[in-house]
């Protein structure tokens, strides 16, 4: 099969012919139709995650080694399976979304269906080959979400959607305005999900005027603010009286400082972004204002199933999708790295076209 692989960090991804994976035991082989492109792919391809300043975490320390097949927003069809998978011939060809955040299968987190908290992750597109290959091996059928009736862009729910849904679930209070920092693909999806969950009013924050306009006019954000404004925190406080929750999809120094400054007493800050910020709020302030600080990393298999149910029920507004061939993966990474993508890029493998449900 053909796979698009990182052979050398910070260099273009290369198409290579590699052996087809063979399912054994409980394995399921999925033929990949499409795979969404994520900022995590940008970090992994460059070879490090920024920790702020000059500090960097090499991705080799997280279990990714070259040659690596990235891609974790996977939509495909069941192709083959191992003898203890629990599947039958009737399942072959069934459309599925793949939950990629697979754990070791043995620790307390995995046994409690919280694979995303596993200390020894085996995530597809990271520690294990992902959807930038034409076929992907999934350890167990429980990580396959039925996608009947959904179109082939639905793989984005496995990260772009799940990341926002799980982060919103971590906000403690639900009785006031909620801020979303960064309204790119994940932020717009989170906005759509927040509306489906009857949260809000929603305050959108970004540095891109076009994205803010889209968030307000098409996705229901009641207010929007350009975070480059020198007094944006004061503007938000005056307009809302403070926010009960902020989800930060950027994670830069400026965004964490802004988020903490606009929270009400008892508010929740949820950080998702990986752009190198550091928390510098005095501990006395945390205590006096009774703030809740949470990190959020994707979500559980159960949360993905809940999210897909929302989508199937027609309660989510689709985000802008740019369907492109997998051969253009490097161009997509360049645009995403430069912040030139509104919504999501979804790459399709050769001889595979987007299917409508």
Identify the residue ranges that each predicted region occupies.
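NAD(P)H dinucleotide-binding glycine-rich loop of Rossmann-like/cofactor-binding domains
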Residues: 58-72, 101-181
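Mid-domain Rossmann-like dinucleotide-binding core that forms the NAD(H)/NADP(H) cofactor-binding site
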Residues: 92-95, 134, 148-229, 234
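C-terminal hydrophobic helical "lid"/dimerization subdomain
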Residues: 257, 301-357
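Glycine- and other small-residue-rich loops at beta-strand/loop junctions that grip anionic moieties
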Residues: 99, 157, 180-183, 204-205, ...
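Glycine-rich cofactor phosphate-binding loops and adjacent beta1-alpha1 units
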Residues: 170-175, 212-292, 353-357
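Residues in the short beta-alpha loop(s) of Rossmann-like NAD(P)-binding domains
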Residues: 48, 208, 275, 299
């Amino acid at each position: 099969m053909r796979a698009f692989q990182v052979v050398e960090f910070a260099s273009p991804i290369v198409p290579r012919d590699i052996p087809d994976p063979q399912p054994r035991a409980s394995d399921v082989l999925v033929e990949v139709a499409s795979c969404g492109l994520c900022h995590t792919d940008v970090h992994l391809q460059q070879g490090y995650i920024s920790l702020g300043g000059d500090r960097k975490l090499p991705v080799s320390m997280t279990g990714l080694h070259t040659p690596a097949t990235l891609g974790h927003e996977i939509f495909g069809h069941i192709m083959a399976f191992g003898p203890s998978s629990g599947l039958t011939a009737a399942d072959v060809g069934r459309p599925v979304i793949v939950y990629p955040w697979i754990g070791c299968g043995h620790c307390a987190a995995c046994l409690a269906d919280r694979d995303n908290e596993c200390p020894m992750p085996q995530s597809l597109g990271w520690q294990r080959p992902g959807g930038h290959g034409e076929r992907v091996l999934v350890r167990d059928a429980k990580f396959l979400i039925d996608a009947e009736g959904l179109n082939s862009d639905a793989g984005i729910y496995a990260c772009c959607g799940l990341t926002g849904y799980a982060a919103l679930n971590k906000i403690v209070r639900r009785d006031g305005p909620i801020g979303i920092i960064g309204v790119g693909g994940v932020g717009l999806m989170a906005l759509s999900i927040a509306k489906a969950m009857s949260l809000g009013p929603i305050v959108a924050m970004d540095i891109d005027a076009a994205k803010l306009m889209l968030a307000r006019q098409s996705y229901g954000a009641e207010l929007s603010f350009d975070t480059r404004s020198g007094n944006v925190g004061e503007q938000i406080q005056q307009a809302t009286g403070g926010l009960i929750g902020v989800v930060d999809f950027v994670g830069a120094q400026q965004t964490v400082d802004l988020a903490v400054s606009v929270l009400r007493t008892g508010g929740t800050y949820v950080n998702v972004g990986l752009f190198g910020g550091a928390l510098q709020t005095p501990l006395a302030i945390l205590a006096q204002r009774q703030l809740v600080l949470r990190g959020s990393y994707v979500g559980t298999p159960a949360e993905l199933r809940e999210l897909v149910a929302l989508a199937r029920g027609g309660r989510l507004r689709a985000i802008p999708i740019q369907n492109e061939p997998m051969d253009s993966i490097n161009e997509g990474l360049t645009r995403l790295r430069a912040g030139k993508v509104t919504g999501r890029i979804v790459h399709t493998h050769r001889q595979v076209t987007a299917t409508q449900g």
